[in-house]
Amino acid sequence: MAEKPKKPQKLKARLPRGLEDRDPAAIRATREMVEKIRAVYELYGFEPVETPAMEYTDALGKFLPDQDRPNEGVFSFQDDDEQWISLRYDLTAPLARYVGERYGTDGLVLPYRSYRVGYVFRNEKPGPGRFRQFMQFDADTVGSATPAADAEICMMAADTMEALGVQRGQYVVKVNNRKVLDGVLEAIGLAGDENAARRLTVLRAIDKLDKFPADEVRKLLGPGRWDGGEEGKGDFTKGANLSAAEADVVLAITKPRDDWKEAIAAAEAYLAKSEVGQAGVSELEEIAKLVMASGYGADRIKIDPSVVRGLEYYTGPVYEVELLLDTKDEKGRPVRFGSVGGGGRYDGLVSRFRGEPVPATGFSIGVSRLQAALTLLGKLDTRPEFGPVVVTVFDRDRVADYQKMVASLRTAGIRAELYLGNPKNMGNQLKYADRRNSPCVIIQGSDEKARGELQIKDLIEGAKAAAAIASNQEWRESRPAQFSCAEADLVAKVREVLARHDVSWG
């Protein structure tokens, strides 16, 4: 007995982990948000530039000294000339390569002010809220070492939040300086390569000051902390093993204060013997004076010595935009929404291509994360966008007539489409238009054609009327929101329907 032929295997449709598909409503909300950010950046004199999604891996700084393969965190492949190429993991490293190629030429005016928007890619383990592809929107000034450039970035970040509808009191731009943190580590005797691991532990503890009370952070600075609330309960995090006096110094300098002058005074007092620490304090003081002179109070921009950001990357001031909103974590517990963007000064990044110092400072907004926050605030229109006006096909042999109607609507700037499914059932055509969220449909049978007329069915008004009609018979007799007009009046009458319901397309 012959074997039955095997059915061809169907390919399973599945999305790789850490990625997401996006629907029209989400795309429209992103576009609306990006345009508002763009308007603020351009108001400050920043101009757009685009760099490719791929760069040579060494340009991204993703080779370790003892490896001939890119280290973790990037998606990479070898070109046919055996050069390693990687997908960009941020928008700053490609900018450094772009500037390095053009530095000193007529094609680059210094200080160079640019913005970029696009997707970046991280080869990391995905999880809740952690994606392998996400959008960033950056602005950077290259070629200016003055704290005025850093102050401007902070002011622009504040203006961007307000342009997006985030009110004062719902956000704050927090500013610190890498040099201040280096001074803190110097003051407690953790200079030198032999203390690298302890320095990192101290910085991680400081970074917890916005999440834990000072007493809990003190445990992380000391022997360690049990996350169950008492010894022996929960997981244990090993601490930095600082003495009580050393922990006092760290907490005194990094304590968040509402008055920037108090924050500066505390840092100055404890970092008097640290040259690098004093330089950082001086830069913070200059930034504070500049933003205050421009009318930005501590409710918008504040000095916060507890801010810790990507310390291997930054060389001076660092900034973080925090949303002061309460949301819930995956266990339903109330938590602060937290950071939606940040940046800082990175004077060493461009210099890799130049062999000389090139000052630079910039700011990056996590578009996807900020969009989630704005949706939570109700600042983005997440309703489905109106679909096009649908011209139905009543008579199969008159498709050319219907296509002419579609063309006249499009010429007038009205979104329109011809129904391209099986025209046998008019009910299915109307269901299609309804599912497409169309504001109205156009119907013309042979009788209407003979009279030089057509029918316009207002689907929005029809839905409202349907809710008030008790029986199918009443529905058939009344045919709510459907009216006739002359063929020549098609565009004008459709415009009346659109205006009645404030229909517009972004």
From Swiss-Prot:
Disulfide-linked positions: none
Pfam families registered for this protein in UniProt: HGTP_anticodon, tRNA-synt_His
UniProt-recorded Gene Ontology molecular function terms: ATP binding; histidine-tRNA ligase activity
Subcellular location(s) per record: Cytoplasm
Annotated EC: 6.1.1.21
UniProt entry keywords in alphabetical sequence: Aminoacyl-tRNA synthetase, ATP-binding, Cytoplasm, Ligase, Nucleotide-binding, Protein biosynthesis
Name of protein: Histidine--tRNA ligase
Catalytic activity reported: tRNA(His) + L-histidine + ATP = L-histidyl-tRNA(His) + AMP + diphosphate + H(+)
CDD domains with a match to the protein in the record: HisRS-like_core
HAMAP family: His_tRNA_synth (MF_00127)
UniProt-listed InterPro entries: aa-tRNA-synth_II, aa-tRNA-synth_II/BPL/LPL, Anticodon-bd, Anticodon-bd_dom_sf, His-tRNA-ligase, HisRS-like_core, HisRS/HisZ
SUPFAM superfamilies assigned to the protein according to its UniProt record, in alphabetical order: Class II aaRS ABD-related (SSF52954), Class II aaRS and biotin synthetases (SSF55681)
Subunit structure: Homodimer.
GO biological process terms, semicolon-separated: histidyl-tRNA aminoacylation
Lineage: Bacteria, Pseudomonadati, Pseudomonadota, Alphaproteobacteria, Hyphomicrobiales
GO cellular component: cytoplasm
Gene3D superfamilies linked to this entry: Anticodon-binding domain, Bira Bifunctional Protein, Domain 2
